[in-house]
C-alpha cells in the first residue's frame, strides 16, 4: 500500500463522523506495521475512527482523518494505544499501557482458544476419563476470567466452559460438562491450567429447537405482509438520515456497535439539537449461583468482548420487515486484516398503533392519527445469548432505547433429582440454568437546544396543606454536582429525571427539557463487597451525570477485562464532583433484567424487552404532531379506506 495515497484512504468518506472505511482501516494498519508495530508478535484489537472534537465539528473547520488503534504485543505481554494520521501517514501517538491492562478479546482469539483446548493432551486425557473421546463433538466456549483476587498481571487469559453434542446440530447447552474449566493464555499460546473437579454426570436429555427436531410447523397463521408501495419515508445520504422531523448520523464501532450522532428535531423549520452522541456504553451479566463454575460468570459483553464485532449480518424478512436500509460495519481481525459485517445495522419504519385520538360525543365526530416509528437496530450474538439493540424515534419527539434479549440460556449440570435453589431445573436429567441479571448502561451526550444543560430529579410529593388527602405534586430538585447526581430509581415516588436548558425557554417561560422515564431500573443484586460489584459499580446506581470529558467513554472504564475496578469508570470520574449545572454534560442510565429463569425459556428463549424512554417535557409549545394527515390505510384493492379495512 502507498502510504501517501490520501485520495485512496478517503474513499467513501463524506463527513468527519463517518466510520472508517475498509481502505482507511487497511491504511492505518499498514502505517503501524511500517512503524512501531512491525514485529510479528503484535495483534490488533481495534482500529476505529478517532472522532473530531466537538468544538471542531461545531466550527466546521477541516479536520484530519485519524484512527485510534489498540494493540497487544504478545512477546512483551503488553498493550498499546496508537493515534494514526491517515492523511499524513504518520503515527502521532504511541502509548504503552500499564502492565495490568488487558484490552477486549478478538473473534479469532476465541477460535484460537477453542482450537488449543481441543488439542491439549491434558484436556484430552481428562475428558477421556469422563468417557468423552470424540473431540469433534466437544464444544469449548471461551469466557473472560474476570477478577477474583488473583495475580494475573501480564497474562491474557480466557477460561473455556465445556459442553458436548450428541451430533453435529445438537444443542451443546443441553449437555454441560460441569466442574471442568480450561484456562488458556493468549500471550503464551498455551493451556496454563485445567480445573477438573467433582464429576457430575453430563445431562443426556436433548434441548433442540431446529425444525428437523421439533417436527412440522403450524399452518394456521395467515400471511402478514408489510407493504410500502411508495417506499420508505426516510432519506439517506451516506451515513446521514432524515425522517419526518428527525435527522441524525449513523455510526458503528467495534466496542459499541450502533452509534447515533447529532440527533436533531426540526421544529417550526428549525433543526433543534437533542443528543450529540448516544450508544451502549457497557453491559454486564452477573450470575447468582454459588456453584464453583457458575459463581465466576460475569461477562462484560461490551468491554471484554467488543460487542460491535459480534453483530450479525441481518436479513430481510427475519430480522427486519418492510422497506429496509442497511449499513455495513467495518472492523479488523487480530492480524490487521480489515473485514466487513454486511448489513450490520438495519433501519426501517414500523406502524405504532394510535398516536392520538378524540371522539367528540357532542358533534359525533372523531379524529385519529396513527403513530409510526423509525427503527435503527443491530443484533449481536455473544456465545449463547442474542441481544438485539434498538433505537426508536417517534413522530412526537420521543426516543426509546430497547434491548430484546433472546438466544439460549447459559446452563449448568447438577445431580439428577437435585433442585438447585439458585436456578431453575430444565428437565429431570440434571440440567438447570442459574439465576442471573442483564445490566446495561447507555451513554447520552446531551445537547438540548445547545451545549449548556442541567439535570433535575422529579419526585411526587404530598403538600402540607392537603385537607382532602388527595393532593400530590411533582417537585423538581436540581442536581448540582456529579456526586449529587448518583441516583437510584424510586417507583414509590414516581421518579424521573429531566434534562433541561435554562437558556432556552418555552411558551410559558420554563426551560425546555426532555425527561428520562426510568423503566427497568434495577440495580446489581450482588453484595457491594463482591468482586463483580467493585468492577461493575456503574450498575449499583441507575443515574450518573458527568461533566463532558472525551476520554470518559465507557461506564466500567476503558479496559474492564481482568480489571479490579479500582482505577477507572464512572465511580472514579465522579469523585471529582464537578459542576453539572449549565454546562456540557453526559447522562448515563443503567437498567436491566432480573432473570429468574422459567421452563418456557428453554430450549430457546422467547424475546424479553428491556429499555427506557426519553420524552419531550416542555421542549415544544404544544403537541408537535397536529400536522399529521388523517389516518387511512390502503385496502388490498388499492383503494383508500378510512382508518382500516373491515369485514361487515
Curated annotation (Swiss-Prot):
Residue ranges listed under propeptide: 1-9
Chemical reaction(s) catalysed: a primary methyl amine + O2 + H2O = an aldehyde + H2O2 + NH4(+)
Enzyme class: oxidoreductase
Cofactor comment text: Binds 1 copper ion per subunit. Can also use zinc ion as cofactor. Contains 1 topaquinone per subunit.
Record-annotated active site: 301 (proton acceptor), 385 (schiff-base intermediate with substrate)
Presence of keyword Lipoprotein: no
Keyword Metal-binding: yes
Region (Disordered): 629-648
Modified residues (2',4',5'-topaquinone): 385
Domain of life per record: Bacteria
Disulfide bonds: 320-346
InterPro entries for this protein: AGAO-like_N2 (IPR054157), Cu_Am_Ox_Cu-bd (IPR049947), Cu_Am_ox_TPQ-bd (IPR049948), Cu_amine_oxidase (IPR000269), Cu_amine_oxidase_C (IPR015798), Cu_amine_oxidase_C_sf (IPR036460), Cu_amine_oxidase_N-reg (IPR016182), Cu_amine_oxidase_N3 (IPR015802)
Post-translational modification: Topaquinone (TPQ) is generated by copper-dependent autoxidation of a specific tyrosyl residue.
Induction: By methylamine.
UniProt keyword terms in alphabetical order: Copper, Disulfide bond, Manganese, Metal-binding, Oxidoreductase, TPQ
Any one GO MF annotation of this record: copper ion binding
EC number: 1.4.3.21
Gene Ontology biological process terms, A to Z: amine metabolic process
Binding site for Mn(2+): 445-446, 584
Residues that hold substrate according to the record: 299-310, 382-387
Binding of Cu cation, residues: 436, 438, 595
Summary of subunit composition and partner proteins: Homodimer.
Family: Belongs to the copper/topaquinone oxidase family.
Record protein name field: Copper methylamine oxidase
Lineage: Bacteria, Bacillati, Actinomycetota, Actinomycetes, Micrococcales
Amino acid at each position: 500500500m502507498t502510504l501517501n495515497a490520501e485520495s485512496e484512504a478517503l474513499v467513501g468518506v463524506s463527513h468527519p463522523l463517518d466510520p472508517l472505511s475498509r481502505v482507511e482501516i487497511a491504511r492505518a494498519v499498514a502505517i503501524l506495521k511500517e512503524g512501531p508495530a512491525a514485529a510479528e508478535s503484535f495483534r490488533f484489537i481495534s482500529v476505529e475512527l478517532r472522532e473530531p472534537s466537538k468544538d471542531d465539528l461545531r466550527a466546521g473547520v477541516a479536520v484530519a482523518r485519524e484512527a485510534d488503534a489498540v494493540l497487544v504485543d504478545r512477546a512483551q505481554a503488553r498493550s498499546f494505544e496508537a493515534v494514526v494520521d491517515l492523511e499524513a501517514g504518520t503515527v502521532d501517538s504511541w502509548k504503552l499501557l500499564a502492565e495490568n491492562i488487558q484490552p477486549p478479546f478478538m473473534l479469532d482469539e476465541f477460535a484460537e482458544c477453542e482450537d488449543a483446548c481441543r488439542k491439549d493432551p491434558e484436556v484430552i486425557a481428562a475428558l477421556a476419563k469422563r468417557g468423552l473421546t470424540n473431540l469433534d463433538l466437544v464444544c469449548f466456549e471461551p469466557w473472560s476470567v474476570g477478577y477474583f483476587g488473583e495475580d494475573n498481571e501480564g497474562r491474557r487469559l480466557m477460561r473455556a466452559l465445556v459442553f458436548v453434542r450428541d451430533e453435529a446440530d445438537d444443542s451443546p447447552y443441553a449437555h454441560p460438562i460441569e466442574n471442568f474449566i480450561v484456562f488458556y493464555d493468549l500471550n503464551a499460546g498455551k493451556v496454563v491450567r485445567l480445573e477438573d473437579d467433582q464429576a457430575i454426570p453430563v445431562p443426556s436429555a436433548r434441548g433442540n429447537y431446529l425444525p428437523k427436531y421439533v417436527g412440522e410447523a403450524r399452518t394456521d397463521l395467515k400471511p402478514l405482509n408489510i407493504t410500502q408501495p411508495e417506499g420508505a419515508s426516510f432519506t439517506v445520504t451516506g451515513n446521514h438520515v432524515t425522517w419526518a422531523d428527525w435527522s441524525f448520523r449513523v455510526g458503528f464501532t467495534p466496542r459499541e456497535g450502533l452509534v447515533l450522532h447529532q440527533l436533531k428535531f426540526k421544529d417550526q423549520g428549525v433543526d433543534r439539537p437533542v443528543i450529540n452522541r448516544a450508544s451502549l456504553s457497557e453491559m454486564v451479566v452477573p450470575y447468582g449461583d454459588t456453584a464453583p463454575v457458575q459463581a465466576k460468570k460475569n461477562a462484560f459483553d461490551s468491554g471484554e468482548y467488543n460487542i460491535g464485532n459480534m453483530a450479525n449480518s441481518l436479513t430481510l424478512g427475519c430480522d427486519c420487515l418492510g422497506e429496509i436500509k442497511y449499513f455495513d460495519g467495518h472492523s479488523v481481525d487480530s492480524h490487521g486484516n480489515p473485514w466487513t459485517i454486511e448489513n450490520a445495522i438495519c433501519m426501517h419504519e414500523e406502524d405504532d398503533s394510535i398516536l392520538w385520538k378524540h371522539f367528540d360525543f357532542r358533534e359525533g365526530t372523531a379524529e385519529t392519527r396513527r403513530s409510526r416509528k423509525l427503527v435503527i437496530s443491530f443484533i449481536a450474538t455473544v456465545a449463547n445469548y442474542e441481544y438485539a439493540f434498538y433505537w426508536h424515534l417517534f413522530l412526537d419527539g420521543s426516543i426509546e432505547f430497547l434491548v430484546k434479549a433472546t438466544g439460549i440460556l447459559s446452563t449448568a449440570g447438577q445431580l439428577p433429582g437435585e433442585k438447585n435453589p439458585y436456578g431453575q431445573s430444565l428437565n429431570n436429567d440434571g440440567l438447570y440454568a442459574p439465576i442471573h441479571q442483564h445490566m446495561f448502561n447507555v451513554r447520552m451526550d446531551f445537547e438540548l437546544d445547545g451545549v449548556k444543560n442541567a439535570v433535575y430529579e422529579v419526585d411526587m410529593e404530598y403538600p402540607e396543606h392537603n385537607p382532602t388527602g388527595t393532593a400530590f405534586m411533582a417537585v423538581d430538585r436540581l442536581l448540582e454536582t456529579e456526586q449529587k447526581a448518583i441516583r437510584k430509581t424510586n417507583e414509590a415516588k414516581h421518579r424521573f429525571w429531566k434534562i433541561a436548558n435554562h437558556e432556552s425557554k418555552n411558551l410559558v417561560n420554563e426551560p425546555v427539557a426532555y425527561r428520562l422515564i426510568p423503566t427497568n431500573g434495577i440495580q446489581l443484586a450482588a453484595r457491594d463487597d463482591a468482586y463483580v460489584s467493585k468492577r461493575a459499580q456503574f450498575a449499583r446506581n441507575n443515574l450518573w451525570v458527568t461533566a463532558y470529558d472525551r476520554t470518559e467513554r465507557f461506564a466500567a472504564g476503558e479496559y474492564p477485562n481482568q480489571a479490579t475496578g479500582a482505577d477507572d469508570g464512572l465511580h472514579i470520574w465522579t469523585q471529582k464532583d464537578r459542576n453539572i449545572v449549565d454546562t456540557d454534560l453526559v447522562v448515563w442510565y443503567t437498567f436491566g433484567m432480573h432473570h429468574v429463569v422459567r421452563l418456557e425459556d428453554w430450549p430457546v428463549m422467547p424475546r424479553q424487552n428491556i429499555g427506557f424512554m426519553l420524552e419531550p417535557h416542555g421542549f415544544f409549545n404544544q403537541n408537535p404532531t397536529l400536522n399529521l394527515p388523517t389516518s387511512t390505510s390502503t385496502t388490498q384493492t388499492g383503494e383508500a379506506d378510512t382508518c382500516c379495512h373491515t369485514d361487515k
